[in-house]
Amino acid sequence: MGVSDVPRDLEVVAATPTSLLISWVAGAEDYQYYRITYGETGGNSPVQEFTVPHDLVTATISGLKPGVDYTITVYAVTDMMHVEYTEHPISINYRTEIDKPSQHHHHHH
């Protein structure tokens, strides 16, 4: 098979009720940057998007709602002759944790 030239193995490596840390394995290609989109799965709210530099393989998504299914997609973008060329995106679905307010009031001495 050889080395994949597209990003792969997208996963959530850390999560809170309102934010996710995602990471992926970079492809062999020399990309300009990655575009990450996220939104509620099957929701009709607009999808948010942002970009990260090509040398990063992690991103933090914040401002999420607790206990909601999100679809997260990562695109690798190459700038060919000023035309953005997007490689095969990878997507995952992830449900954020339910916020448990009681946890915030426990102080361990």
Model-identified regions with their sequence ranges:
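Extracellular low-complexity, O-glycosylation-prone stalks/linkers
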Residues: 1-62, 69-109
